[in-house]
Amino acid sequence: MVGPMGEEMRESMEIAMTLAQHTMAERMKQRVYYDIIVTLGVDEEVMYDGPSAGLAIYISAMGAMLGWESSPEVAVTGEVKRDGSVIRVGGIKNKMRLAALGLISTVLVPVGNAKTLGKSEYEDFGGDLDILGVSHVDEVALGEYHGR
Protein backbone atom coordinates (compact mmCIF):
# COMPACT_ATOMS: atom_id res chain seq x y z
CA MET A 1 0.00 0.00 0.00
CA VAL A 2 1.51 3.23 -1.17
CA GLY A 3 0.43 6.78 -0.36
CA PRO A 4 -0.18 9.11 2.57
CA MET A 5 -2.64 7.32 4.82
CA GLY A 6 -3.41 7.12 8.49
CA GLU A 7 -3.55 4.00 10.61
CA GLU A 8 -7.33 3.59 10.34
CA MET A 9 -7.21 3.63 6.53
CA ARG A 10 -4.24 1.24 6.46
CA GLU A 11 -6.14 -1.22 8.69
CA SER A 12 -9.24 -0.88 6.49
CA MET A 13 -7.16 -1.69 3.41
CA GLU A 14 -5.60 -4.72 5.07
CA ILE A 15 -9.04 -6.06 6.03
CA ALA A 16 -10.38 -5.50 2.50
CA MET A 17 -7.38 -7.19 0.86
CA THR A 18 -7.57 -10.17 3.25
CA LEU A 19 -11.29 -10.60 2.54
CA ALA A 20 -10.65 -10.46 -1.21
CA GLN A 21 -7.93 -13.10 -0.90
CA HIS A 22 -10.27 -15.37 1.11
CA THR A 23 -13.08 -14.86 -1.40
CA MET A 24 -10.78 -15.89 -4.25
CA ALA A 25 -9.52 -18.92 -2.30
CA GLU A 26 -13.13 -20.06 -1.82
CA ARG A 27 -13.91 -19.54 -5.51
CA MET A 28 -10.81 -21.40 -6.68
CA LYS A 29 -11.06 -24.10 -3.97
CA GLN A 30 -7.39 -23.51 -3.25
CA ARG A 31 -5.16 -20.81 -1.86
CA VAL A 32 -4.28 -18.24 -4.49
CA TYR A 33 -1.65 -15.53 -4.49
CA TYR A 34 -1.75 -12.24 -6.34
CA ASP A 35 0.59 -9.29 -6.21
CA ILE A 36 -1.66 -6.26 -5.96
CA ILE A 37 -0.30 -2.82 -5.27
CA VAL A 38 -2.76 -0.29 -3.92
CA THR A 39 -1.75 3.28 -4.70
CA LEU A 40 -3.64 6.33 -3.54
CA GLY A 41 -3.62 8.97 -6.25
CA VAL A 42 -3.96 11.88 -3.89
CA ASP A 43 -2.24 15.07 -2.82
CA GLU A 44 0.96 13.90 -1.09
CA GLU A 45 0.74 16.76 1.41
CA VAL A 46 -2.66 15.68 2.74
CA MET A 47 -2.98 12.78 5.19
CA TYR A 48 -5.95 10.55 4.41
CA ASP A 49 -7.52 8.41 7.09
CA GLY A 50 -10.73 6.62 8.00
CA PRO A 51 -12.36 3.30 7.14
CA SER A 52 -14.75 4.51 4.40
CA ALA A 53 -12.62 3.18 1.53
CA GLY A 54 -12.84 -0.46 2.68
CA LEU A 55 -15.58 -1.54 0.26
CA ALA A 56 -13.96 0.31 -2.64
CA ILE A 57 -10.62 -1.38 -1.94
CA TYR A 58 -12.32 -4.79 -1.73
CA ILE A 59 -14.06 -4.23 -5.08
CA SER A 60 -10.81 -2.99 -6.63
CA ALA A 61 -8.90 -6.05 -5.40
CA MET A 62 -11.59 -8.43 -6.68
CA GLY A 63 -11.64 -6.57 -9.97
CA ALA A 64 -7.88 -6.88 -10.33
CA MET A 65 -8.02 -10.63 -9.71
CA LEU A 66 -11.09 -11.32 -11.87
CA GLY A 67 -10.48 -8.83 -14.65
CA TRP A 68 -13.52 -6.69 -13.90
CA GLU A 69 -13.57 -3.36 -15.64
CA SER A 70 -14.39 -0.39 -13.48
CA SER A 71 -16.72 2.39 -14.46
CA PRO A 72 -15.97 6.06 -13.84
CA GLU A 73 -19.72 6.51 -13.31
CA VAL A 74 -19.78 4.35 -10.16
CA ALA A 75 -18.71 5.56 -6.72
CA VAL A 76 -18.33 3.39 -3.61
CA THR A 77 -18.13 4.04 0.11
CA GLY A 78 -18.39 1.72 3.09
CA GLU A 79 -16.43 0.35 6.01
CA VAL A 80 -15.74 -3.38 5.79
CA LYS A 81 -15.45 -5.46 8.96
CA ARG A 82 -13.40 -8.67 9.30
CA ASP A 83 -16.55 -10.80 8.91
CA GLY A 84 -17.29 -9.15 5.54
CA SER A 85 -20.15 -7.00 6.76
CA VAL A 86 -20.37 -3.49 5.34
CA ILE A 87 -21.26 -0.90 7.96
CA ARG A 88 -22.38 2.72 7.99
CA VAL A 89 -19.96 5.55 7.33
CA GLY A 90 -20.02 9.20 8.27
CA GLY A 91 -20.40 12.18 5.99
CA ILE A 92 -22.76 10.34 3.65
CA LYS A 93 -24.75 13.42 2.61
CA ASN A 94 -21.59 15.25 1.60
CA LYS A 95 -20.39 12.19 -0.31
CA MET A 96 -23.69 12.00 -2.20
CA ARG A 97 -23.58 15.71 -2.93
CA LEU A 98 -20.08 15.37 -4.43
CA ALA A 99 -21.14 12.32 -6.43
CA ALA A 100 -24.10 14.23 -7.85
CA LEU A 101 -21.82 17.11 -8.86
CA GLY A 102 -19.54 14.74 -10.75
CA LEU A 103 -20.28 12.29 -13.53
CA ILE A 104 -21.46 9.63 -11.08
CA SER A 105 -24.67 7.75 -11.86
CA THR A 106 -24.49 4.89 -9.32
CA VAL A 107 -23.26 4.87 -5.73
CA LEU A 108 -22.76 1.73 -3.63
CA VAL A 109 -23.20 2.55 0.05
CA PRO A 110 -23.74 0.54 3.24
CA VAL A 111 -27.36 -0.58 3.62
CA GLY A 112 -27.55 1.39 6.87
CA ASN A 113 -26.71 4.59 5.01
CA ALA A 114 -28.98 3.78 2.06
CA LYS A 115 -31.96 3.45 4.41
CA THR A 116 -31.39 6.95 5.79
CA LEU A 117 -31.10 8.63 2.40
CA GLY A 118 -34.61 9.38 1.28
CA LYS A 119 -35.11 9.97 -2.43
CA SER A 120 -35.98 13.63 -1.84
CA GLU A 121 -32.72 14.14 0.05
CA TYR A 122 -30.42 13.06 -2.74
CA GLU A 123 -32.53 14.65 -5.47
CA ASP A 124 -31.80 17.90 -3.64
CA PHE A 125 -28.13 17.29 -4.37
CA GLY A 126 -28.79 18.12 -8.00
CA GLY A 127 -28.15 14.70 -9.45
CA ASP A 128 -30.03 11.60 -10.49
CA LEU A 129 -28.17 9.02 -8.42
CA ASP A 130 -28.95 5.32 -8.30
CA ILE A 131 -28.07 4.51 -4.67
CA LEU A 132 -27.57 0.81 -3.95
CA GLY A 133 -27.25 -0.57 -0.42
CA VAL A 134 -24.66 -3.27 0.32
CA SER A 135 -24.73 -5.27 3.56
CA HIS A 136 -21.91 -7.78 2.91
CA VAL A 137 -18.96 -8.07 0.54
CA ASP A 138 -20.40 -11.34 -0.80
CA GLU A 139 -23.06 -9.31 -2.60
CA VAL A 140 -20.32 -7.68 -4.64
CA ALA A 141 -18.22 -10.86 -4.97
CA LEU A 142 -21.22 -12.72 -6.37
CA GLY A 143 -21.60 -10.07 -9.03
CA GLU A 144 -24.87 -8.53 -7.87
CA TYR A 145 -23.48 -5.11 -8.78
CA HIS A 146 -21.02 -6.15 -11.49
CA GLY A 147 -21.37 -4.20 -14.68
CA ARG A 148 -22.93 -1.16 -13.03
Enumerate the predicted regions with their spans.
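Peripheral, non-AAA+ core regions of ATP-driven protein-machinery
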Residues: 1-148
